């Protein structure tokens, strides 16, 4: 029997990319899904394309409306009576040099990629504690383990997620709370197109590394396996995954390798 069968899973950033593919694959596994993103009409389309749309509810939200986190959680719990797994997938990337990036862009990235996730996760914590069970799944990035040019704000926000959720795991393991940090490498989504540039506008173009990355289908299969195994951390991608281990033992070598790669 599939360990995730009948679990209530709340996915943020569910309107596209990894979040959308997760919805499709989890629906095939007979999970009960709550899909969140800003655009209600897009969420409806994703729901209708799921294998079991009757077991899919949508909860439109803007993750940076921190003051509404408690009410969003209350609504999410009421939809099926509980939430078993919260998949924090909403986020935005960046493509700009530090010297050419407005400070406001850093604030926007931090609000979306870090504080929005923290707000929703903290709001649902009492529910997990009450049930003595709950699983946070956080879509971070390999950029949460090491850095790369043009992604300074994105790297900073993803590094922050690891700091927060490592503490969450330690403080609430005794309450049955689990944390899985998922670190994608290059995945073929529109993340580069929607990345913020130095003045806050969208890049609106893709790059070869992203286009040649893992398919969302392949990536999500591996991610779901990690969720079922309740792994602490998982790194999913191509050869770029080796950067995590090179960073740990040979940080100067990784510095040279990343600069040589000239990845945008």
Where are these regions (language model features)?
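The beta1-alpha1 cofactor-binding region of Rossmann-like NAD(H)/NADP(H)-dependent oxidoreductases
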Residues: 60-71, 103
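Conserved glycine-rich cofactor-binding loop
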Residues: 15-16
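Substrate-binding pocket helix/loop in short-chain dehydrogenase/reductase
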Residues: 97-98, 102-108
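Active-site helix of classical SDR
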Residues: 121, 157
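SDR active-site lid
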Residues: 174-238
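Residue(s) in the substrate-gating loop at a strand-loop-helix junction
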Residues: 141
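Conserved glycine-rich Rossmann-like NAD(P)H-binding loop of the short-chain dehydrogenase/reductase
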Residues: 29-46
